Amino acid sequence: MALKLISLNIEGKRHLDKVVPFLTEQKADVVCLQEVFEEDLPKLKDQFYSNHLFLPTWHTNQHFNLEIKEGYSPGEKLFGIAILSPLPLTELLASHLDPKLPEIPKNSGPGTWNPGLIVAKAGDLTIATTHFTWTRFGQADERQQQHLQILLNLLDPYPELILTGDFNAPRGEEIHATLASRFVDHTPDVDTTLDPKLHYANRNEPGKLKLVVDHLFTTSTITVEEITVKNGVSDHCAVIAHLA
């Protein structure tokens, strides 16, 4: 089944004026989103993406970029990951990765959400998406390593799948290397998935920070015909894949 898939970290409410028209224009078969407020799903779905799955990973009222001094507001709004599609979606799995945290903890600082994983069937394809564990400098720590093992164990039952999302794990570092040894990495030629202007680290010096942290992996049985990245939509670039 030919399929167009988009993965995008939308950074909460910051870029909805760009994200909504982008998704409407793209008319993808499947959209995997990270950092989504549940209350914004009707707007994001527009009239094209009639089906969705959502997994909350945080209670928060305010976004969380410490570097731009916004402060922290735990709040009660549900914030997490989502899959949108005009195709029927069958949820196969929705799980959090940190058994030591409440399923939906309150925002108490950067990286304090409970990382999540959704696995769903869209048409003939099994699609998994995650907003993976954050570390301050993108270096793997013990918690991130533990969560990776949990994620891989959760994916074991699916012999054929697409895995995408914001992994908070730069290409070439330990977490990415482990994933790339198990799956086919389809973004080896991508220069960065951090927007050169909209990401907080690039706002004063465009293009200063270049990291590939948004990845698309598949099992070897799936053919990806083309991968592109699109900036100017959010603080992360949109990863757009055309699958055979």
Label for each model-derived stretch:
Residues 112-113, 142-149:
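Charged helix-capping and loop-helix junction motifs
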Residues 8, 50-56, 184-188:
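Short hydrophobic/aromatic-enriched beta-strand-loop microsegments
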Residues 34-37, 55, 95, 133, ...:
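Conserved residues at the C-terminal ends of beta-strands
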Residues 2-11, 93-95, 124-134:
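Active-site-proximal beta-strand elements of phosphoester/diester hydrolases
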Residues 156-161, 168-244:
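Metal-dependent phosphoester-hydrolase catalytic domains
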Residues 36-124, 228-230:
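Structured beta-strand-rich core segments of catalytic domains in phosphoester-bond hydrolases
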Residues 7-12, 105-109, 138-142:
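Short, flexible loop segments at the rims of nucleotide/cofactor-binding pockets, characterized by
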Residues 5-9, 19-45, 84, 127-130, ...:
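Active-site beta-strand/loop signature of hydrolases that rely on acidic residues for catalysis
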